[in-house]
Amino acid sequence: MPPLLRVEGLKVYFHMPRGVVRAVDEVNIYLNKGEIIGIAGESGSGKSTLALGIMRLIMPPGLIEGGNVYFEDTEVLHLPEKVFNSEYRWKRIAMVFQGSMNGFTPVYKIRDQIKEVLEVHGYTGDPDQRVNELMKMVNLDPSIADRYPHELSGGQKQRAFIAMALALNPQVLIADEPTTALDVITQTHIINLLKQLRKELGISIIFITHDIALMSMIADRMYIMYAGRIVEHADTADIVRKPKHPYTKLLMEAVPDPSKDYIKGIPGFMPDLARLPPGCRFQGRCPFVMDICKREEPGLKRVENSEVACWLYG
């Protein structure tokens, strides 16, 4: 069975006065039906831009410079905007944006804001009944929809925004940092909710985070992203057990350990995406850097059960 969603060679560049920022540079990912994949990396690695590129929500000075996005067998990146907006965006592919729990309009009740989404997209059923269904779907009492955003806790707002993203029964949900600014207990509740939605609705999920430990709780497969490129891809169990790219190893080592009184960070800084060095983009921070790393950029190659972009593996 072909993937439900497939991204091939996606490029998203930002044309700035200081140069062209290659935020997403020839990225390939795929998502199977009923699967949860994770995209992990530090802030600035291109994760959110990749998601916005899939949704075709890149704003100037950003441009989608190349690549393809396939939903089932249909190439959707180059469809007319009117067609993509009416047939795919929110109806087949929906997104919970980073910081979305603060994205509700403060002067309108939650119910009215979800109903507006339904009405704009031509929903023909009873909108109030649909809102009630959606609230129950995310384990909230329907009466919460009759409150203003400021009357909800952070976890309740995040659940309500997930409900709004599910309003039109999408087959794919992109969740961009859905647990940011939530306490650990609430984070776990959101993770469990997404798992529940996958089980009950059969929805496929792209889960984006900088927290690789959190991702290991939910994702079937992981993509590790650095400076606009995928540097490692494997089943979650394989990455957790035996990470191969030096960056992935350092991300794993940076996960806080309660038994230790310090946190190990990753030394150095991500390169300027408008002035990328020749060769590997991780060379300036890599403890295993070699001469070839400074001359040639590695491509993804198969190493055991993983795909890795690193000269350590030939």
Sequence positions of predicted segments:
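Conserved ABC transporter NBD signature motif
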Residues: I64-V76
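Conserved ABC ATPase signature
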Residues: Y148-L152, Q156
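P-loop NTP-binding/switch modules centered on Walker-like glycine-rich loops
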Residues: P178, L182-D261
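Short catalytic/signature loops enriched in Gly
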Residues: H233-G314
